[in-house]
């Protein structure tokens, strides 16, 4: 088996350009991450291969110049960096299928919620470089938030490689695995929470007489603008909020209504509930 780019030099070097990358699974998260890697300019699309059991999601990858296959074995045999982008309950089945072909030259990156590094390392050959990564849906637009955590045999070199390749996907951060479940609630599920808020904002404007189509467009732009300002200003959310709240003005009256409705507690509770569910899924996989 030839694993081009299998050198220990994983920094921004010609070796990165030569690395072979594989995806097992062809869903939205795989597509977003693959787009980010291509956008990095570090790896040509021809160095990427993706497998899926059907052709349903593969055409969009082919349009990007990525090789496609129905064989997971082909992905493992022709790649050094392999992303596991299948549903959590399928992970054990996939690893059982490919584990005999995985070597210490491979880097295995799991994108599955709830599947711990310990579980991955148990199902793979001893010494395998394992990393957990939790992206979110905006990775498809290269505006994602990704948290990565390294296993016991992965370290600075693998971190450098992934940060180089995934930077265009959006914000890339590293942390202990204990933060992964919180990240699922904050950013993975949090995207849907923001959509609920956007819908509610638009509904409020409709109640006050604005056409629904216009209200949805303005709600989306309002959230986008507020997010960019929060990200780029360096200010705390409370500071930016205070800048909008003039004494006796419209905004402070609206915030009072949110507080009376338990908005802040509901948001905290939503992140907690999603995080706990991610932890439960992980515990179920351990028992299985």
UniProtKB/Swiss-Prot annotation:
Question: So which domain of life are we looking at?
Answer: Eukaryota
Cite the PROSITE patterns for this sequence.
Answer: P5CR
Tell me the compartments it is located in: Cytoplasm
Top enzyme class? oxidoreductase
* Catalytic reaction annotation: L-proline + NADP(+) = (S)-1-pyrroline-5-carboxylate + NADPH + 2 H(+); L-proline + NAD(+) = (S)-1-pyrroline-5-carboxylate + NADH + 2 H(+)
**Listed GO biological process terms:** L-proline biosynthetic process
> Which InterPro entries does the entry mention?
6-PGluconate_DH-like_C_sf (IPR008927), NAD(P)-bd_dom_sf (IPR036291), P5C_Rdtase_cat_N (IPR028939), P5CR-like_CS (IPR053790), P5CR_dimer (IPR029036), Pyrroline-COOH_reductase (IPR000304)
Give the Enzyme Commission number: 1.5.1.2
- Quote the function comment for this protein: Oxidoreductase that catalyzes the last step in proline biosynthesis, which corresponds to the reduction of pyrroline-5-carboxylate (P5C) to L-proline using NAD(P)H. Proline is synthesized from either glutamate or ornithine; both are converted to P5C, and then to proline via pyrroline-5-carboxylate reductases (PYCRs). PYCR3 is exclusively linked to the biosynthesis of proline from ornithine.
User: What is this protein called in UniProt?
Assistant: Pyrroline-5-carboxylate reductase 3
Provide the species name. Answer: Danio rerio
Q: What gene, per UniProt, encodes this protein?
A: pycr3
């Amino acid at each position: 088996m030839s694993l081009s780019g299998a050198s220990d030099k994983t920094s921004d070097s010609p070796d990165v350009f030569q690395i072979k990358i594989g995806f097992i699974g062809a869903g939205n998260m795989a597509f977003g991450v693959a787009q980010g890697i291509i956008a990095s300019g570090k790896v040509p699309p021809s160095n990427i291969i993706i497998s899926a059991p059907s052709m349903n999601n593969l055409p969009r990858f082919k349009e990007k110049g990525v090789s496609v296959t129905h064989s997971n074995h082909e992905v493992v045999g022709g790649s050094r960096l392999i992303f596991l982008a299948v549903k959590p309950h399928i992970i054990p089945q996939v690893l059982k299928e490919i584990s005999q072909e995985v070597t210490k030259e491979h880097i295995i990156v799991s994108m599955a919620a709830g599947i711990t590094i310990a579980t991955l390392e148990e199902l793979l050959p001893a010494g395998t470089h394992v990393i957990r990564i939790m992206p979110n849906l905006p990775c498809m637009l290269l505006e994602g938030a990704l948290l990565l955590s390294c296993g016991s045999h992965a370290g600075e070199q693998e971190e450098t490689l992934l940060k180089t390749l995934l930077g265009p996907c959006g914000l890339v951060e590293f942390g202990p695995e204990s933060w992964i479940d919180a990240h699922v609630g904050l950013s993975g599920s949090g995207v849907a929470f923001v959509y609920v808020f956007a819908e509610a904002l638009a509904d409020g404007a409709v109640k006050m007489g604005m056409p629904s189509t216009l209200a949805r467009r303005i709600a989306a732009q309002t959230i986008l603008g507020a997010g960019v300002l929060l990200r780029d200003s360096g200010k705390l959310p409370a500071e930016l909020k205070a800048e909008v709240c003039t004494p006796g003005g419209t905004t402070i009256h609206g915030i009072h209504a949110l507080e009376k409705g338990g908005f802040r507690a509901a948001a905290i509770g939503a992140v907690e509930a999603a995080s706990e569910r991610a932890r439960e899924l992980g515990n179920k996989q351990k028992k299985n």
